[in-house]
Amino acid sequence: MKTFDSLYEELLNRAQTRPEGSGTVAALDKGIHHLGKKVIEEAGEVWIAAEYETDEELAGEISQLIYWTQVIMVARGLKPEDIYKNL
């Protein structure tokens, strides 16, 4: 099972090693504007899932929101510790 920290490390590794065919690398290459739109999209899907879907579907949408948020973190050079100090 992945954790917030292990997912971040995986995404950071992909950004650094740039494996061919990586969706994360492709998203990073599209820039912050694209990534921001994905975060907004996923946040909306979390809201809809919270209103109308099962807990399992909601958990899936929340995981996608966390993924895209972490891709933005990688793009901007933020580390989990930068987030933790604001919780």
Swiss-Prot record:
It is found in: Cytoplasm. This is Phosphoribosyl-ATP pyrophosphatase. Its EC number is 3.6.1.31. GO terms for cellular component: cytoplasm. PANTHER family: HISTIDINE BIOSYNTHESIS BIFUNCTIONAL PROTEIN (PTHR42945), HISTIDINE BIOSYNTHESIS BIFUNCTIONAL PROTEIN HIS7 (PTHR42945:SF1). Keywords: Amino-acid biosynthesis, ATP-binding, Cytoplasm, Histidine biosynthesis, Hydrolase, Nucleotide-binding. Gene3D superfamilies: MazG-like. It catalyses: 1-(5-phospho-beta-D-ribosyl)-ATP + H2O = 1-(5-phospho-beta-D-ribosyl)-5'-AMP + diphosphate + H(+). It comes from Corynebacterium glutamicum (strain ATCC 13032 / DSM 20300 / JCM 1318 / BCRC 11384 / CCUG 27702 / LMG 3730 / NBRC 12168 / NCIMB 10025 / NRRL B-2784 / 534). The gene is hisE. It comes from the Bacteria. Pathway: Amino-acid biosynthesis; L-histidine biosynthesis; L-histidine from 5-phospho-alpha-D-ribose 1-diphosphate: step 2/9. The keyword Nucleotide-binding applies. It is an enzyme of class 3 (hydrolase). Belongs to the PRA-PH family. Its main location: cytoplasm. Pfam families: PRA-PH. One of its GO terms (biological process) is L-histidine biosynthetic process. The keyword Transferase does not apply. One of its GO terms (molecular function) is phosphoribosyl-ATP diphosphatase activity.
